[in-house]
From Swiss-Prot:
One of its GO terms (molecular function) is methyltransferase activity. One of its GO terms (biological process) is methylation. Expressed in stems, roots, flower buds and leaves. The lineage of its organism: Eukaryota, Viridiplantae, Streptophyta, Embryophyta, Tracheophyta. Belongs to the CFA/CMAS family. Probable N-methyltransferase not involved in benzylisoquinoline metabolism. Shows no detectable activity with (s)-coclaurine, (R)- or (S)-reticuline, papaverine or (R,S)-tetrahydropapaverine. The keyword S-adenosyl-L-methionine applies. This is N-methyltransferase 4. Its EC number is 2.1.1.-. S-adenosyl-L-methionine binds at residues 93-94, 128-136, 155-160. It comes from the Eukaryota. The gene is NMT4.
């Protein structure tokens, strides 16, 4: 590769024209994440801790969330038909759990829901809130398995809410409702509280974790309630997913600037003013990498169907083509990121909290 083509602008120009093949794209992405590791790791343990503490403290001076509107438009309001052409049968957009190597993507979706329910200690008869519920895979799984429970999904995507309510009708479920709202602004009427609150790969869009957890804790029942959080993390350092330098073509291309933060695996331990940690687990990043690999395979197989849905939804073939290129880059980027060091750099953290 000619060195001049490494400049971010040149790479983006070639990418949007469809001039970069899969293997070259993967290598270009790998270079960006190597740079991110170089920036994240510090020379000594003392420097590493000092950097992490400075980051944690900086979050407490920020507003509650990142750019929710931008990320919602780019990721969560795409036509359902286009999304369905890529994901598994329950349209799970967060990491699946490949408990067995031989599992299909559909089986790994269910395995992830089962693991979430086990670690969140979901039981029949509870009231459950799923914040950032996506297309409702976990909501519908819980509602069908725990028939005496009531499950509330909260999403800021009208497309997602409409899809979930269609499934609720098809399945004749009477124990589900879905709220269309921005979690940072929403308040429940009559001070409604829940036995379990689930936040699965949604806290990445928050900045001021202290404010967020304080707000969520007010929705927890005073007795025997738990908050279960799943978030993508780095094992050692926290980092906003923002451009690192002028050659960083990748970061703001795949996600809106300022919309995502990758906390370290231990970062939430510093935010126990309103909740306290009961347990914590760490999953290999390979589960996310494998999920993205499977989605990318389906994306390529169903590209024609996805493109048709995008063309209808976005109004032009050119717009659909650009989203397809962006999606390809997104999938490949996550595969590269969560495969680093055999899945032991960027990983998946699970936390169980109780209300203080």
């Amino acid at each position: 590769m000619d060195s001049k083509d490494q400049h971010g602008t040149k790479i983006l120009e070639r990418l949007v024209k469809g001039e970069i093949g899969d293997e070259e794209l993967k290598e270009l992405i790998r270079i960006r994440f190597e740079k991110r590791l170089q920036c994240g790791y510090k020379p000594t343990p003392q420097d590493q801790l000092a950097s992490e503490m400075a980051f944690i403290k900086s979050l407490k001076d920020m507003k509650m969330s990142g750019e929710l509107e931008a990320v919602n438009t780019e990721l969560y309001e795409l036509p359902t038909a286009a999304v369905a052409a890529t994901l598994g049968s329950t349209l799970k957009q967060s990491a699946c759990y490949f408990k067995e190597e031989s599992m299909s993507i559909d089986e790994a979706e269910i395995a992830a829901y089962e693991l979430d329910c086990e670690r969140a200690q979901i039981k029949d008869g509870q009231t459950i809130l799923d914040i950032g519920c996506g297309f409702g895979g976990l909501v519908l799984h819980i509602a069908q398995k725990y028939k005496n429970s009531h499950v509330t999904g909260l999403t800021n995507s009208a497309e997602q809410r409409n899809y979930i309510m269609l499934q609720v009708e098809k399945l004749s479920l009477s124990n589900v409702d879905v709220i269309l709202a921005d979690v940072t602004k929403h308040e429940f009427e009559n001070e409604k509280k829940f036995d379990r609150i689930l936040v699965v790969e949604a806290i990445e869009h928050m900045k001021n974790i202290q404010l967020f957890l304080k707000k969520i804790s007010n929705w927890m029942k005073d007795e025997d309630s738990f908050l279960f959080v799943v978030h993508l993390c780095h094992k050692a350092f926290s980092q906003h997913f923002e451009a690192l330098d002028e050659d960083d073509w990748y970061t703001s291309y795949v996600l809106p600037e300022g919309s995502v933060t990758y906390l370290s695996a231990s970062a939430l331990l510093y935010f126990q003013d309103d909740v306290s940690v009961v347990d914590q687990w760490l999953l290999s990043g390979t589960h996310m990498a494998r999920s993205q690999e499977e989605w990318f395979k389906r994306f390529k197989i169903n590209l024609e169907a996805a493109s048709k849905a995008l063309t209808v939804g976005l109004g032009s073939e050119e717009a659909a083509n650009q989203v397809n290129i962006q999606y390809k880059t997104f999938f490949m980027g996550y595969v590269v990121q969560f495969s680093f060091n055999n899945g032991e750099e960027w990983m998946i953290s699970h936390y169980l909290f109780k209300k203080k």
